[in-house]
């Protein structure tokens, strides 16, 4: 399986301080859909047909682009002679015109949208629009897993409280699929260090989240990716999954809106190893790409001494250690191991 993030633009109609892109301050460029399709065709010819392409439309905000361009790329993705999946990440703070609504509900396998503490909703009207759009899509799709809510783990979000978050966001909007992502300090987050939690705060939060889920018996009702990544390690001995999967630089491509190519979308505007005009062979053998793969593969020395390495695998290499240690929720993992 290859994950392919296609950035339709580098800009957005919002300014979230945690965002790994740069919000409305991002470059005012839009994708060249013919070059995107040509690149996908090259990749399709190069890779084995039994390898699935999981394609996600990203930005900035994908739906500030022309709908005819979105439909053209969707047509091309579905025309490939292999198994494909097409989804989108979108802020849902815009009018759901009939053509947008049709594209989302008829052409995509699902969408991811975010709810965050600071900057995400600048007015009460924006929040109400977001909630209204979610309900509209839910009513049409009748699929509880179609919409995934993602929230970035910032200091303000931690202070907001788990119970309040579930009551005011998850339960209120009938959400059944969600994730809480660890913050990586890229893009706008570089300019806002006050929102970055310590790694101990991250570990403590996920332990408390697990306790909340256990107390309210929520695992049967809501899929929470960040916890499922941990649970399946213990229950199914499946170690390489989610953010603990240290092969992102090998199995992931991000096509920036200006036509440059990277891997991890969090650092895609700067960690570039080629362009869509390059051959796939040239991209794969790029010294910069090989260096990024090497960076991801090599663990900090301390990891090799840890008794949980087999479960953690070192974690996402974009998550740096601080004076409080790493971000892996060790207390939670140890308790789950002891219960098996």
For the regions a language model picked out, list residue spans one by one:
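Short Fe-S-cluster ligation motifs
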Residues: 42-59, 326-340
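Active-site metal-binding loops of divalent metal-dependent hydrolases
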Residues: 60-62, 92, 251
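Conserved, mostly hydrophobic/aromatic
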Residues: 12, 16, 57, 259
